[in-house]
Structures are given as C-alpha cells and as structure tokens.
Amino acid sequence: MRILGIETSCDETGIAIYDDGLGDSPEGILAHRLYSQIAVHADYGGVVPELASRDHVRKTIPLIKEVLADANLTPKDLDGVAYTAGPGLVGALLVGCSIGRSLAYGWELPAVPVHHMEGHLLAPMLEDDVPEFPFVALLVSGGHTMLVRVDAIGEYKLLGESVDDAAGEAFDKTAKLLGLDYPGGPALSKMAESGEAGRFKLPRPMTDRPGLDFSFSGLKTAAGTLVRKECLNLSDSDLKQTHADIANAFQQAVVDTLAIKCKRALQQEKLSRLVIAGGVSANTALREQLAITTKKLGGSVFYPRPEFCTDNGAMIAYAGLQRLKAGTDADLTFKANPRWALDSLPPVK
C-alpha cells in the first residue's frame, strides 16, 4: 500500500509518500520533501502562528506535486492520504487537515488523521535497525517532553511528562539569553562543544524525588541568573568563552535529567529497549549519554536519522499507513485537535 503523508503542525511543511511493500525501512520512503519556515520567523525570535499558517497554505500543494513527481506517481497510484490532525498550532493544523481531507475526497481515497507525537514515536521504524515491542519512548521536542511505555502501535501508557516548559523550548529560550539567533537549540548545542565542562553547575530538576515527570522552567531561570551574574564587564573573548561554558552546563543539565528519568522508566517498567524521538533527539550529547545509560542496564537505544528527528512527512505517512491498514477513514466532518492526548489513541489491531 502507498500513502501520502502531510505534516503542517508548526513551522515546517513536510510531505512524503511511503510504500509498505518495500518493508519497514528507508527503502519504503519513495519520496519526501521538507520546507522550513526558519527565515519567516527569524526576525521575531520564535514561531508566529498566523505567519506559519499562511506559509503552509503557500507551500503544501506545490510540495505535494513535487513529491508525486519525485516518486513518478499519480494520485491513482495512492491508497490513502494521511495528515497531522494534532497536537500543534490550530491554524497550521487546519491547513494540513483541510488540504489532506479535500484531496482524499477528490481522489476517492481514505483519509487518515494522524497524531503528531505518534508519528515521532514511530519514526525509528523507518530505519534498518528497528526496536521490538515493548519499549520505553522518550519524546522530546520544542513542544513536548514525555516518557511513554509502548506495547504495540496505539497501546501507549504515559509514564511522565513536562509540567511546564518542554526541553526543546528551554533550549531555545536559554539560547536567546546567550544572544543566539532563532532557532537557538542547535546553535546552543554547537556553542556547548567549546565550553569548559564543570565550570558552572546547574540543577537537574525533579531528579531528587520519585516520579517520571519533568520540569525545565526552573533550569531556564537558573541559566538566566547565571548569565546576568557571570557576563558583566567581560572582554569579547572572555564573554564568548563564558557563554560557551554556560551553554555546556545547561546542555549537560538537560541531558543528565533526561538520562536519569529514562533509567528510572526502564527500571520501573522492567524493559531494556529505549526509543528517543522528536527534534531534541538529534542532540549528539543526549544520544551519547543515553547509549551509556542503556548499555549499563544491558539494553539498547533506538532513534531516527537526524533528518527525521524534526517534523517531517515521512513519519506521518508511516504512522498513517498503520492506521489505514487498521481501517481508519475519517468522515467529512474532520477537525484539528491542538491538544490531543497520545494515550487516548485506539490500538491498531
């Protein structure tokens, strides 16, 4: 079966076609295109929802045409249309939902609304080395940080989540404090590479108590306090190094916090396989630390290739195909669901 996937939940327009006849591997991705709105939002220091929606309107249909041409296919060669229905920015979601549902109707194909975080969770299934069920998943991005027990597709148990800022959001806000341009998360990670480890110490939030929830708001505040305290009356070279040292301390605090919680989750659920997905899962320091953590537990860690860590159409196409094979076909009264609980999804039978 072949399915078109449409992703428009935030500030990236992702379109892909996936064919399960080629297996759960990179070869199943017949074509994919991704358009990022970084240039649109850079002057504002963050995503402007109205501008995001308008840009999705401008780019979605042209990208669909390009992906069909890349795969040398026509709509008659497809078996369904999948689109992100939530969570995300409601205006951005409505663009993808309306286009996806309309195309499915016009092409006389099933329409499959997809949960954005289920797409991220299943993204490692697009690799050659795929995890077996059950496993613990760490979903970590700009909008979400959560730990989930996964027994099968659609069988999800929420173990813990952020009670305030997501990890990716904390990265971006701290990067702004350090004078880095939007999007700041990757830039902060790059800056941290030249920082002196151990010069500054920041807290590991909520690791001193039981439970698997996260909190990054206080860590962001602590980093801001450190910037204001340590970055006064410095030469340009000293300021640059101090910023790098603070970036290193911040990143290590986030990585340690995530690793501690992942270890707890694996031990609590008596599992050995860990999946990490979402934009922050591309962070090299996080991958290295979680590899060490799982190895000590006799387990292993799985993650998507970097290009599929961020929002993309391939993960939506793959997740949508699993739902399509289970009989999902949305009626014409579709809706966007900006606050859609992952553990409310029905299992795939």
Curated annotation (Swiss-Prot):
Enzyme class label: transferase
Catalytic activity, reaction form: L-threonylcarbamoyladenylate + adenosine(37) in tRNA = N(6)-L-threonylcarbamoyladenosine(37) in tRNA + AMP + H(+)
GO terms of molecular function: iron ion binding; N(6)-L-threonylcarbamoyladenine synthase activity
Positions that bind substrate: L139, V140, S141, G142, G143, D172, G185, N283
Swiss-Prot/TrEMBL cofactor(s): Fe(2+)
Disulphides: none
Pfam families named in the record: TsaD (PF00814)
EC number: 2.3.1.234
Compartments, as annotated in UniProt: Cytoplasm
Residues involved in Fe cation binding: H116, H120, D311
InterPro entries linked to this entry: ATPase_NBD, Gcp-like_dom, KAE1/TsaD, TsaD
Annotated GO biological process: tRNA threonylcarbamoyladenosine modification
Primary location: cytoplasm
Cofactor note: Binds 1 Fe(2+) ion per subunit.
GO cellular component: cytoplasm
PANTHER family tied to this protein: TRNA N6-ADENOSINE THREONYLCARBAMOYLTRANSFERASE, TRNA N6-ADENOSINE THREONYLCARBAMOYLTRANSFERASE, MITOCHONDRIAL
HAMAP family per the UniProt record, alphabetical: TsaD
Function as written in the Swiss-Prot or TrEMBL entry: Required for the formation of a threonylcarbamoyl group on adenosine at position 37 (t(6)A37) in tRNAs that read codons beginning with adenine. Is involved in the transfer of the threonylcarbamoyl moiety of threonylcarbamoyl-AMP (TC-AMP) to the N6 group of A37, together with TsaE and TsaB. TsaD likely plays a direct catalytic role in this reaction.
Protein name: tRNA N6-adenosine threonylcarbamoyltransferase
Encoding gene (name): tsaD
